[in-house]
Amino acid sequence: MSISDPIADMLTRIRNAQAVQKPVVLMPSSKVKVAIAKVLQDEGYIESFEIKGEAAKPVLHIDLKYYAGRPVIERIDRVSTPSLRIYKGRHDIPEVMNGLGIAIISTPQGVMTDRKARATGVGGEVICYVA
């Protein structure tokens, strides 16, 4: 079965797994999904991630993070979709929850947080908001 929006599928899998307190979530891997997982790990929203399986069909394993029995990720929302891409210039990059959350942005220099994009002086496609 073909998935029309693999990034939205990734975010939904994470959201659903955390709703039922799963320790690990599995999904088909891609370069963009790995880059998003790297940002989530660097920002402390997930414990770790790794790619397993054969080269033809790699599987991304994400170890979810909980604090006092509650998921660390309170909200994770898709912003830019395949049918409606949302691009922001370097001066228009949004702040999520007044700086308490992050926006994950795909820039020409790679996938990064809103803070790093502002510091680097680049804009790009706003993939999702995480809080």
UniProtKB/Swiss-Prot annotation:
Note one Pfam family from the annotation: Ribosomal_S8
Q: Which GO terms describe its cellular component?
A: ribonucleoprotein complex; ribosome
**Would you say which domain of life the source belongs to?**
Bacteria
**GO MF term set:** rRNA binding; structural constituent of ribosome
Kindly state which keywords UniProt assigns to this record, in alphabetical order.
Ribonucleoprotein, Ribosomal protein, RNA-binding, rRNA-binding
Biological process (GO), any one: translation
Tell me the protein family, please: Belongs to the universal ribosomal protein uS8 family.
Q: Subunit info?
A: Part of the 30S ribosomal subunit. Contacts proteins S5 and S12.
Q: What does this protein do?
A: One of the primary rRNA binding proteins, it binds directly to 16S rRNA central domain where it helps coordinate assembly of the platform of the 30S subunit.
What NCBIfam families does UniProt report for this protein, alphabetically?
PRK00136.1
Q: What is this protein called?
A: Small ribosomal subunit protein uS8
The species is Polynucleobacter asymbioticus (strain DSM 18221 / CIP 109841 / QLW-P1DMWA-1)
